[in-house]
Amino acid sequence: MNAHTFASGRMAKLRQKWMLALALALMHAVLGLGLGLGGVPAHANGLDSLEQFMRQAKTGRAQFTQVVTAPAKPGQTARSKTSSGIFEFDRPGRFLFNYQKPFVQTLVADGQTLWMYDADLNQVTARKQAQVLGSTPAAILTSANDLKALQADFVFQAEPDKEGLQWMRATPKAKDGQIQSVLAAFRDTDKGPALAVLEVQDSFGQRSVLTFTAYESNPAFSATNFQFKPPPGADVLRP
């Protein structure tokens, strides 16, 4: 194995690990957290916004910018990387991330399979969603029917309003998962709350902040929008 092949393989593993962590975070924060929140106290502004968002927005589309900051190593400063693209979702269980800069990458959950495609490496990784979620609190989120079921595994709290946004936090009670906490912020619009910021802190010390703009509530998607077919010639991995 030459150095280029080794470096490419290492890069592929790092990208897959990062994209999988992002997928789990999105299943937590966008597709699942709002299930059964009808009993949220009226004074909890961030939770109220989440409840209304989940009740009203069955589908959505937005542009996003993501900044991922890795913890600083001894003697070094923290490293950050920025990416951007288009995000779409259709509850329950389907979403699409089209990364356009700096690399073309696609992350698709079709309700059965989680697909991760790296155009630069011409590589596809396919995982069954149920297996991916099986060892995480997201498995409970996507099947919970009421707030009581969610409270068995998560602590929900409203955060103070900041910069004109309503904030809430969800913290897993289990200490062995990949996600330490999720912060979500909503912006008031004439069509109801719009998802504005998603901040994820993982167990590796990595912090991901996604800022959403040009949000559209309940757009109509084609039947094939969340389907994925590996490009001809792409390597397909099914770990």
What are these regions (language model features)?
Residues 13, 17, 21-38:
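Bacterial N-terminal signal peptides
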Residues 65-71, 98-100, 117-119, 171-173, ...:
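A generic structural motif
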Residues 45, 125, 149-239:
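Gly/Pro-enriched, hydrophobic low-complexity segments
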Residues 135-149:
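Short, solvent-exposed helix-to-loop capping segments enriched in aromatics
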Residues 1-16:
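N-terminal secretory signal peptides that target proteins for export/translocation
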Residues 86-138, 208:
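An acidic-aromatic
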